[in-house]
Amino acid sequence: MDSKSKKITIPEFKKRKANGNKVTMITVYDFPMARLVDRSPAEMILVGDSLGMVIQGLEHTNPVTLEEIIYHARAVRRGAPNTLVVGDMPFMSYQVGPEQALTSAGRIIKESSADCVKMEGGRYVAPSVERIVRAGIPVIGHIGLTSQSASALGGFKVQGKTPEEARMLIDDARALDEADGLKVCLQSTGFKRDPFISSRHSWRWYARSQ
């Protein structure tokens, strides 16, 4: 199988989403797997903090450090030069505030050559998302089941099962959209094709299954 001829650009990605075309993102942590994905039609790779559980054998993602994300993202970038690479921002690399978030995002982009970053959280991290985007770094939001706050959520449980929880997710998505987030990763929620979500054509949704 031949490699992709070129990497999808951020403007091309936005155009595809605006036209309703699907985009595929696969989670990868190392050079060999990145090489395989680069030879596939998949447009994006996520270097997730889940590497703590999948690669390191940890019980949670929170111990993963910014340096470890950078290390793995750098390896993935070498293996997938023609695929858009997303670097996950690990626990406590952005929670302090917008300036810390910008510094962490900048390190991921500068030191690993990733194309954009992903952040967990909704309206509470929207100011940090806006700060990073203003600096020229694309950001993907992540709401629903967020592993970094799983303890506060009562464990790895489906979110948005009640009308109140669903409304909170919609508010989170709106806040990220207003902060100019590239798209939103909606993980493990209790509703599918919710009319409130599907009617918001300006929202960039990416459904990720557990």
How would you name each of these model-derived features?
Residues 2-209:
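Alpha/beta enzyme core
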